[in-house]
Protein backbone atom coordinates (compact mmCIF):
# COMPACT_ATOMS: atom_id res chain seq x y z
CA UNK A 1 0.00 0.00 0.00
CA UNK A 2 1.22 3.46 -0.81
CA UNK A 3 1.04 6.52 1.41
CA UNK A 4 1.36 9.00 -1.49
CA UNK A 5 0.02 12.34 -0.24
CA UNK A 6 1.42 14.94 -2.66
CA UNK A 7 2.72 15.26 -6.23
CA UNK A 8 4.26 18.36 -7.80
CA UNK A 9 5.62 19.10 -11.29
CA UNK A 10 8.55 21.54 -11.21
CA UNK A 11 9.81 23.14 -14.43
CA UNK A 12 13.56 23.79 -14.29
CA UNK A 13 15.97 24.61 -17.11
CA UNK A 14 16.89 20.95 -17.58
CA UNK A 15 13.28 19.78 -17.79
CA UNK A 16 10.07 19.26 -15.85
CA UNK A 17 10.68 17.16 -12.74
CA UNK A 18 7.99 15.18 -10.91
CA UNK A 19 8.29 15.23 -7.11
CA UNK A 20 6.24 12.72 -5.12
CA UNK A 21 5.92 12.51 -1.35
CA UNK A 22 4.75 9.57 0.77
CA UNK A 23 3.84 10.25 4.40
CA UNK A 24 2.83 7.28 6.53
CA UNK A 25 1.16 8.93 9.50
CA UNK A 26 0.74 5.58 11.27
CA UNK A 27 4.08 4.02 10.26
CA UNK A 28 6.19 7.17 10.64
CA UNK A 29 7.46 6.73 7.08
CA UNK A 30 8.54 9.63 4.82
CA UNK A 31 9.68 8.99 1.24
CA UNK A 32 10.59 11.58 -1.42
CA UNK A 33 10.80 10.57 -5.09
CA UNK A 34 12.20 12.79 -7.86
CA UNK A 35 11.36 11.59 -11.37
CA UNK A 36 10.47 8.17 -9.95
CA UNK A 37 13.83 7.76 -8.18
CA UNK A 38 13.86 7.51 -4.39
CA UNK A 39 15.82 10.45 -2.94
CA UNK A 40 14.95 10.20 0.77
CA UNK A 41 13.50 7.40 2.88
CA UNK A 42 12.97 7.76 6.61
CA UNK A 43 11.26 5.17 8.78
CA UNK A 44 9.90 5.52 12.30
CA UNK A 45 9.66 9.32 12.22
CA UNK A 46 7.26 9.79 15.09
CA UNK A 47 7.46 13.55 14.87
CA UNK A 48 4.85 13.77 12.09
CA UNK A 49 5.45 17.43 11.24
CA UNK A 50 8.68 18.94 9.96
CA UNK A 51 10.51 19.21 6.67
CA UNK A 52 12.50 17.18 4.17
CA UNK A 53 15.18 18.90 2.07
CA UNK A 54 16.69 17.48 -1.11
CA UNK A 55 18.01 18.58 -4.52
CA UNK A 56 16.38 18.51 -7.96
CA UNK A 57 17.75 18.59 -11.50
CA UNK A 58 21.14 19.06 -13.12
CA UNK A 59 21.75 22.34 -11.29
CA UNK A 60 21.02 20.65 -7.92
CA UNK A 61 18.27 23.13 -7.06
CA UNK A 62 17.34 23.01 -3.36
CA UNK A 63 13.82 21.79 -2.61
CA UNK A 64 12.03 21.46 0.73
CA UNK A 65 8.75 19.74 1.55
CA UNK A 66 7.10 21.27 4.62
CA UNK A 67 4.76 19.06 6.65
CA UNK A 68 2.34 20.99 8.86
CA UNK A 69 -0.58 19.81 10.99
CA UNK A 70 -3.76 21.67 10.15
CA UNK A 71 -6.23 19.91 12.48
CA UNK A 72 -6.27 16.64 14.34
CA UNK A 73 -4.66 14.14 12.00
CA UNK A 74 -4.92 16.27 8.85
CA UNK A 75 -1.70 17.53 7.32
CA UNK A 76 -0.73 20.14 4.77
CA UNK A 77 2.22 19.58 2.44
CA UNK A 78 3.92 22.51 0.72
CA UNK A 79 6.90 22.54 -1.61
CA UNK A 80 9.55 25.26 -1.59
CA UNK A 81 12.12 25.65 -4.36
CA UNK A 82 15.21 27.73 -3.58
CA UNK A 83 13.52 28.95 -0.39
CA UNK A 84 10.37 30.25 -2.15
CA UNK A 85 6.91 28.71 -2.39
CA UNK A 86 6.47 26.77 -5.64
CA UNK A 87 3.99 29.40 -6.90
CA UNK A 88 6.37 32.30 -6.16
CA UNK A 89 9.33 30.40 -7.64
CA UNK A 90 7.43 29.73 -10.88
CA UNK A 91 6.32 33.40 -11.10
CA UNK A 92 9.95 34.56 -10.71
CA UNK A 93 11.14 31.89 -13.12
CA UNK A 94 8.77 33.06 -15.85
CA UNK A 95 10.52 36.46 -15.63
CA UNK A 96 14.06 35.02 -15.79
CA UNK A 97 13.56 32.32 -18.45
CA UNK A 98 11.91 31.86 -21.84
CA UNK A 99 10.68 28.40 -22.86
CA UNK A 100 9.73 26.96 -26.24
CA UNK A 101 8.31 23.52 -27.05
CA UNK A 102 8.58 22.15 -30.59
CA UNK A 103 8.72 18.94 -32.58
CA UNK A 104 11.81 18.38 -34.73
CA UNK A 105 12.64 15.18 -36.67
CA UNK A 106 9.84 13.36 -34.82
CA UNK A 107 11.20 14.33 -31.39
CA UNK A 108 9.60 16.66 -28.83
CA UNK A 109 12.03 19.37 -27.77
CA UNK A 110 11.92 21.78 -24.84
CA UNK A 111 14.28 24.74 -25.26
CA UNK A 112 14.90 27.02 -22.27
CA UNK A 113 16.82 30.31 -22.24
CA UNK A 114 18.11 31.54 -18.88
CA UNK A 115 17.96 35.29 -19.48
CA UNK A 116 20.44 36.23 -16.74
CA UNK A 117 23.26 33.97 -18.02
CA UNK A 118 22.08 33.47 -21.65
CA UNK A 119 22.54 29.72 -21.09
CA UNK A 120 20.43 27.60 -23.46
CA UNK A 121 19.11 24.16 -22.49
CA UNK A 122 17.48 21.61 -24.80
CA UNK A 123 15.81 18.52 -23.31
CA UNK A 124 17.99 18.66 -20.20
CA UNK A 125 21.29 19.30 -22.01
CA UNK A 126 23.11 22.60 -21.69
CA UNK A 127 23.85 23.63 -25.26
CA UNK A 128 27.11 24.99 -26.63
CA UNK A 129 26.30 28.47 -27.94
CA UNK A 130 27.91 31.30 -29.86
CA UNK A 131 26.77 34.89 -29.32
CA UNK A 132 26.71 37.40 -32.14
CA UNK A 133 25.88 41.11 -32.21
CA UNK A 134 23.55 42.11 -35.07
CA UNK A 135 22.09 45.47 -36.14
CA UNK A 136 18.94 45.27 -33.99
CA UNK A 137 20.20 43.20 -31.02
CA UNK A 138 21.96 39.89 -30.43
CA UNK A 139 21.67 36.33 -31.65
CA UNK A 140 22.66 33.27 -29.61
CA UNK A 141 23.37 30.43 -32.06
CA UNK A 142 23.28 26.68 -31.32
CA UNK A 143 22.49 23.44 -33.16
CA UNK A 144 20.01 20.67 -32.52
CA UNK A 145 20.96 17.70 -34.68
CA UNK A 146 21.61 19.18 -38.10
CA UNK A 147 19.23 22.09 -37.53
CA UNK A 148 20.55 25.62 -37.16
CA UNK A 149 18.88 27.45 -34.28
CA UNK A 150 19.26 30.86 -32.69
CA UNK A 151 17.58 33.01 -30.10
CA UNK A 152 17.23 36.61 -31.19
CA UNK A 153 17.16 39.27 -28.46
CA UNK A 154 15.80 42.71 -29.39
CA UNK A 155 14.64 45.66 -27.33
CA UNK A 156 10.88 46.06 -27.12
CA UNK A 157 11.34 49.82 -26.91
CA UNK A 158 9.16 49.71 -23.78
CA UNK A 159 10.72 49.78 -20.34
CA UNK A 160 8.02 47.51 -18.85
CA UNK A 161 8.47 44.77 -21.50
CA UNK A 162 12.28 44.90 -21.69
CA UNK A 163 14.00 42.57 -24.13
CA UNK A 164 12.02 40.25 -26.40
CA UNK A 165 13.54 36.81 -27.05
CA UNK A 166 12.53 34.84 -30.14
CA UNK A 167 13.57 31.28 -31.06
CA UNK A 168 14.30 30.71 -34.75
CA UNK A 169 14.77 27.12 -36.02
CA UNK A 170 15.58 26.59 -39.71
CA UNK A 171 14.59 30.25 -40.37
CA UNK A 172 11.16 29.62 -38.79
CA UNK A 173 9.93 31.47 -35.69
CA UNK A 174 8.77 29.19 -32.84
CA UNK A 175 6.06 30.57 -30.49
CA UNK A 176 7.09 30.92 -26.84
CA UNK A 177 5.39 28.70 -24.26
CA UNK A 178 3.37 30.78 -21.81
CA UNK A 179 2.92 29.35 -18.31
From Swiss-Prot:
The modification N-acetylthreonine is found at residue 2. Its main location: cytoplasm. The keyword Cytoplasm applies. Widely expressed, with the highest levels in brain, thymus, kidney, and spleen. The keyword Chaperone does not apply. It is found in: Cytoplasm. Belongs to the FAIM1 family. This is Fas apoptotic inhibitory molecule 1. It comes from Mus musculus (Mouse). The gene is Faim.
